[in-house]
Amino acid sequence: VPFRAPKSAAAYRSIWTQEGSPLIVITQQLQEAVQQQVEAPVEIAMRYGNPSIAAAYDNLMKRQPGLEEVIALPLYPHFAMSSYETAVEHSKTIHQKGKYPFSLSFIKPFYNEANYLQALEESITPYLQRDFDHILFSYHGVPQRHIRKSDITGNHCLKNETCCQTASPAHAFC
């Protein structure tokens, strides 16, 4: 696990499987499932590490010479400057610097798409059938400065204690 503090590296190693990194293994399984659904070549790329975005672009060009369009799907269901946006911006930079001839577009955050919500529901339903004491939802935090900066209304997010209780277009970015 390169570039990780020793404690973090040990934690990552503890979840490794014989196949390798769970993130890579599961992403490869997703790639294979998507590839079965579409005729176009499907590649995976990581914002940090390998396989890199440039390697994915190069593989796409090798697999389909004359490629005209690439549609990228950042695997972040939500918008966050520190995840979705940095992946999109880095992908654009690699595309421009590499002078790749294809057009590049991105699938927008899908946190509120019916199919995604249904998949989440289906993944938790078997566990709801069992006896349990509690359900724990774990979320990755987003810095408040990112939330404020992403507030398209400029007057909603974190302006009062009930900002999350009032429907707002700004919720798409927090």
Named regions from a protein language model:
Residues 1-174:
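Active-site-proximal alpha-helix that buttresses catalytic centers in soluble enzyme cores
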